Structures are given as structure tokens and as C-alpha cells.
From Swiss-Prot:
InterPro entries in UniProt: CheY-like_superfamily, LytR-like, LytTR_DNA-bd_dom, Sig_transdc_resp-reg_receiver
Keywords: Cytoplasm, DNA-binding, Phosphoprotein, Transcription, Transcription regulation, Two-component regulatory system
Domain HTH LytTR-type per the UniProt entry, residue ranges: 141-245
Main location: cytoplasm
Subunit details: Homodimer; when phosphorylated.
UniProt cross-references to NCBIfam families, sorted A to Z: PRK14084.1 (NF010684)
SUPFAM superfamilies: CheY-like
Gene Ontology CC annotations of this record: cytoplasm
Protein source organism: Staphylococcus aureus (strain bovine RF122 / ET3-1)
Localization, UniProt: Cytoplasm
Response regulatory domain ranges (all copies): 2-116
Protein's name in the database: Transcriptional regulatory protein LytR
PTM entry text: Phosphorylated and dephosphorylated by LytS.
């Protein structure tokens, strides 16, 4: 875990740093004495846990805690202070704990263990979601052509395009043509890997071979089977995000 200690008193920061090192299990322990240093640290690192004093030189710790909680993925906040009158406000901010100075190692360890337990639970939930998505990626997509239903493995589908009422499904070893609308297949494909890049095209991001600059500030996607599909302007933002350009 990564920890950030925010306190304007050097001795308090040093003591907390020492105690956390004694507890162990921290990849990184950093310090900040004011709001400016705090914001800079939060821009550089993604912390799991923050120890926050209430009385800072340039801002109230409760107000700073409220700002931190507005982050997309806020760290766990443990208020570490000499003042007990802010406890209610702290817990209204969903603080994990509220510890009074002087610090004791047992009390600090108790607070750290709360964060670790929550983090382990969240990690397990995230892993379950990823596993579910991976399992879904192994599922087959039923494609009806004439009097046959072809079961296509999703990982083998390179891209799907539609033109003049004909939908073409490109796979690693074949090409299938059907009159079914693109929307029908889009609903059944795993959104972790498949993305709509145009009103007429859906691609499997695992099968992108190359992306070229195209007209009107768009892109041309070349898939692993050599098929080219253009990214529509209204789909540019989602496409960039899917390949890590945003």
C-alpha cells in the first residue's frame, strides 16, 4: 500500500512514518505539510491511505478531506489529530478512522488493518468482475444464416460491418454474411473487448493491427485480417479511450 501523511508538524509526521514502517507492508510512505504539497503528491501518486491532521497552516483538514473525497478513486482517510471535536464531521466524510494524538502503534495498526480489509474486499470484487467478463468473452455468438446457426467464439471475431442491409462478420478463419442488424450483435458482445467505432462498424480491440490518421481528424483502423474500418467522428472519444490514447 501507499500512504501519505499530511501534517504541518514535522515531529508528528516523523512519528507516524516511524510507526507505519514498524507495522510494515507499505510500498511507499510520503509526507506533506500543506495543501499545495498534498495536491502535488496526489497528482503524482495514487495513495491507498491518507493520514490527515485537522489543523493545517493553510486550510482546515476537514475541508481538505472533503476535496480529496471528490476524487475519482479517493484514498481511505484517517484523521490523526489532537482535537476530538471534529470527529462527527470527519465520519460524515466517510473517514475510515479518527485517531487522537499522541499516537500509539496498536491504535495506528488497528486503523491500517481496517483499510487493508476494505481494500482486500474491493480487490476480490474487482477480480470477480474481470473473471466474469473473461468468461463472457469465451462465450459464443450465435449467427443464423439460411437454415444453419453458426456458433462463433467471440475471441475469434475480428470485426463486424454492415453495408446496404448486409452484415458481414469477419473471423480469424472465415467471413459470414447475414441480414441481421448490427445492433442485435452489439448487445451480445463483450464490451470489454468490442467497441463500436462507426454507425456501421464494430471491432474487437484485440485484433487491431494498426491505426492510421485519416481525413477530418479521424482514424482508419486496420485489423489483423487486413480489413480496414474507419472511425466515425462521433465515436472518436470512446475509441481513443479504448486504445489508451485518453
Amino acid at each position: 500500500m501507499k500512504a501519505l501523511i499530511i501534517d504541518d508538524e514535522p515531529l508528528a509526521r516523523n512519528e507516524l512514518t516511524y510507526l507505519l514502517n514498524e507495522i510494515g507492508g507499505f510500498e511507499e510512505i510520503n509526507e506533506a505539510e500543506n495543501v499545495k504539497e498534498t495536491l502535488e503528491a496526489l497528482l503524482i501518486n495514487q495513495y491507498d491511505i491518507i493520514f490527515l491532521d485537522v489543523n493545517l497552516m493553510d486550510e482546515n483538514g476537514i475541508e481538505l478531506g472533503a476535496k480529496i473525497q471528490k476524487m475519482k478513486e479517493p484514498p481511505a482517510i484517517i484523521f490523526a489529530t489532537a482535537h476530538d471535536q471534529y470527529a462527527v464531521q470527519a465520519f460524515e466524510l466517510n473517514a475510515t478512522d479518527y485517531i487522537l494524538k499522541p499516537f500509539g502503534q496498536k491504535r495506528i495498526e488497528q486503523a491500517v488493518n481496517k483499510v487493508r480489509a476494505t481494500k482486500a474486499k474491493d480487490d476480490n470484487s474487482a477480480n470477480a468482475i474481470v473473471n466474469d467478463m473473461s468468461a463472457n468473452f469465451d462465450q459464443s455468438l450465435p449467427v443464423e444464416i439460411d437454415d444453419k446457426i453458426h456458433m462463433l467464439k467471440q475471441q475469434n471475431i475480428i470485426g463486424i460491418g454492415t453495408h446496404n442491409g448486409i452484415t458481414t462478420i469477419h473471423t480469424t478463419n472465415h467471413k459470414y454474411e447475414t441480414t441481421e442488424p448490427l445492433n442485435r450483435y452489439e448487445k451480445r458482445l463483450n464490451p470489454t473487448y468490442f467497441i463500436r467505432i462507426h454507425r456501421s462498424y464494430i471491432i474487437n480491440t484485440k485484433h487491431i493491427k494498426e491505426v492510421q490518421q485519416w481525413f477530418n481528424y479521424t482514424y482508419m483502423v486496420i485489423l489483423t485480417n487486413g480489413v480496414k474500418m474507419q472511425v466515425g467522428r462521433s465515436f472518436m472519444k470512446d475509441f481513443k479511450a479504448s486504445i489508451g490514447l485518453l
